[in-house]
Design a protein with these regions (language model features):
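Juxtamembrane intracellular "pre-TM" segments in multi-pass secondary transporters
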Residues: 10-18, 197-226
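Helix-breaking motifs and short loop linkers at transmembrane-helix boundaries and internal kinks
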Residues: 54, 86, 107-113, 301-303
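Conserved MFS/SLC helix-loop-helix module at the cytosolic interface between two early adjacent transmembrane helices
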Residues: 73-109
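Helix-to-loop junctions at the C-terminal end of transmembrane segments
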Residues: 75-86, 268-281, 364
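Paired small-residue
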Residues: 97, 101, 112-120, 305-313
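Cytoplasmic helix-loop-helix junction between adjacent transmembrane helices
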Residues: 111, 117-156
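Helix-loop-helix hairpin linking two adjacent transmembrane segments in secondary transporters
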Residues: 113, 141-196
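C-terminal transmembrane helical hairpin of 12-TM major facilitator-type secondary transporters
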Residues: 282-325
């Protein structure tokens, strides 16, 4: 009699969030916001950076590009580290390295050295997201994993407006901001070392070699469809706002108002968890992609009021699609290659965001409608791919 009772109690406790889980999630969200926010932090500071180093604004903007390219590439370079050495160790190492690189950015004497330091910072920052997402999917009880993924997705999405708001409203120089942020990464590393479970000798000592792991992922149609969909999500998101910025005089809208109108809808990331539990992560992601495509179709009508509505719809669609795609990849990957699968997903996500600005400029020269209808079509194709592959069996 006592033994069955004990088993029931253990199962009951294992399916409920504890205080440690809550602290872990909160720390991961704050660290995620601070890490991803570095991608957007220099946008409001372009003029100040140009004045400080005596370069044109177009050159000063490379301070963001240098970080972004290295950040995306870093997912492929470092994405599988936590599969081999453990989530906790890699996260703490990544945050500590980001702190040191952030300090270097603040101390650079010339623009060339600034770009080099920002690239190094991007590489260091790229260590965190795949390992953090893998940690969430493994540490949280199964019923609460979709919520954890939604919270992390929300933090990553909110990083864009939050970082720009911080940089614009603080009145601090780039160096002063970096000096203020560097200790925060170290504090985050210390907090996560305490909050995360003991790492042990390695999380997955029996992990498959890199080549075998990659082959296994490439045999999974559902994962490939999710990677392809990831290319379209931020591509459409950035194309919309780049188009609004470029064509604001013709459209008769205030770009800042359009951005602010879409901000509250990012909270739809929290709706992704119950939707994923009820309908599955692939359907949740597909629904988000379709909503985002409809928003871009609405934007193509080029009416000021409709652009505001499109901004809210697009933010809601992206907020649903991102956690849905993360959960799709995480659920289909095995423990031995989950971080690598999520690293490739994140690389695709930010590659799409990086390609969007120049392609948006080119599409705008063709036709105003093309600027938004082309990414809308890509989003719909991505949704169809997810739906078509969602029932395919995982490769053994």
């Amino acid at each position: 009699m006592p033994r069955p009772q004990s088993t029931v109690n253990v199962n009951f406790q294992s399916n409920n969030l504890t205080g440690r889980h809550g602290a872990l999630l909160a720390l991961l969200m704050v660290c995620g916001l601070a890490v991803v926010g570095q991608l957007y932090l220099t946008i409001p500071l372009v003029a100040a950076i140009g004045a400080q180093f005596g370069v044109e604004p177009s050159e000063a903007a490379l301070s963001g590009t240098a970080f972004g390219i290295a950040y995306a590439a870093g997912f492929l370079i470092f994405g599988g580290l936590s599969d081999r050495f453990g989530r906790k160790r890699v996260i703490v190492l990544g945050l500590a390295a980001t702190a040191l690189a952030t300090l270097l950015v603040a101390l650079m004497p010339s623009f060339g050295w600034l770009l080099a330091a920002r690239a190094l910072q991007g590489l260091c920052a790229s260590i965190f997201p795949p390992a953090a997402l893998s940690l969430v999917t493994e540490e949280l009880p199964p019923p609460h994993r979709p919520l954890g993924v939604s919270l992390m997705s929300f933090a990553f999405l909110v990083a864009a407006p939050a970082a720009q708001l911080l940089a614009a409203s603080s009145g601090l120089s780039l160096a002063a901001l970096m000096l203020a942020l560097a200790p925060g990464y170290l504090l985050g590393a210390l907090g996560l070392w305490i909050a995360a479970a003991a790492p042990g000798p390695a999380n997955h000592p029996g992990a498959a070699p890199a080549a075998a792991s990659a082959t296994s992922l490439l045999r999974d149609g559902g994962i490939i469809a999710a990677w392809a969909a990831a290319l379209t999500v931020l591509f459409g998101f950035v194309c919309f706002f780049s188009g609004v910025q470029t064509m604001a005089p013709q459209l008769g809208v205030d770009p800042q108002a359009v951005r602010l109108f879409g901000l509250p809808a990012l909270a739809f990331a929290f709706a992704a968890a119950p939707l994923a539990r009820s309908y599955g992560p692939a359907i949740t992601a597909s629904f988000g992609l379709v909503v985002a495509a409809l928003a871009l179709g609405l934007a193509a009508l080029a009416q000021p009021t409709l652009l505001l509505v499109a901004s809210a719809l697009l933010s809601a669609g992206v907020a649903l699609a991102v956690p849905g795609l993360i959960a799709t990849v995480a659920n289909r990957a095995s423990a031995s290659n989950r971080a690598r699968a999520l690293a490739i997903y994140t690389f695709a996500l930010f590659l799409g965001a990086s390609l969007a600005p120049p392609l948006a400029q080119w599409l705008a020269t063709l036709a105003a409608a093309a600027l938004w209808l082309v990414p809308a079509a890509l989003l719909l194709l991505a949704a169809l791919g997810l739906i078509a592959t969602r029932r395919t069996a995982k490769p053994s």
